Amino acid sequence: MINRVPIEQRTVEEWDRVQAVNSRGVFLGTKHAIPAMRDSGGGSIINICSVAGYGQSTTQEPAYAASKGAVRIFSKVTATQHAKDNIRSNAIFPGPIDTEMVHAAMSEPKALAERLTRVPMGRLGLVKEIVAGVIFLASDESSYMTGGELVIDGGATSM
């Protein structure tokens, strides 16, 4: 999924495929969840973004970074439009996480080692660390949080 192919060599079909999964998917999920949430008195929308959409695009993958940037702004707009409906919308921004996708993107040992030089904690994050953020945002502990950004990246965006 993550290639180092220059923008001018990309196809519209590649671009659209990534946008369909990452930004259109979030739009459709949100669009269809809002009426049910409103009818039940509120809810919490949690979008999984990426540090690539936070302004730290180390992927060199323009479609992916742009799609995650779209999710970032969409989450904020949703928050402002639906706060009065008691619907909260927040986004989580994972850094490199120990998943099949990250390992596939960095299949060369040098690539992973190089990426980790830009993570102060020096390791991949764990899925359970992202899950903890999701649980927090879904809980009443975050009841006054909407339009927020929870960055879970081992310090990568602080560099």
Language model regions located:
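Alpha-helical segment proximal to the catalytic Tyr-Lys
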Residues: 35, 80-81, 143
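Residue(s) in the substrate-gating loop at a strand-loop-helix junction
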Residues: 50
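Short, small/polar-rich loop/turn modules that mediate ligand/substrate recognition or access, typified
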Residues: 83-88, 145-147
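Active-site loop-to-helix junction immediately N-terminal to the catalytic Tyr of the SDR YXXXK motif
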Residues: 10, 56-65, 77
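Short C-terminal tail/terminal secondary-structure segment
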Residues: 55, 134-135, 146-159
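Substrate-binding pocket helix/loop in short-chain dehydrogenase/reductase
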Residues: 6-7, 11-16, 111, 115
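Active-site helix of classical SDR
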Residues: 30, 67, 75
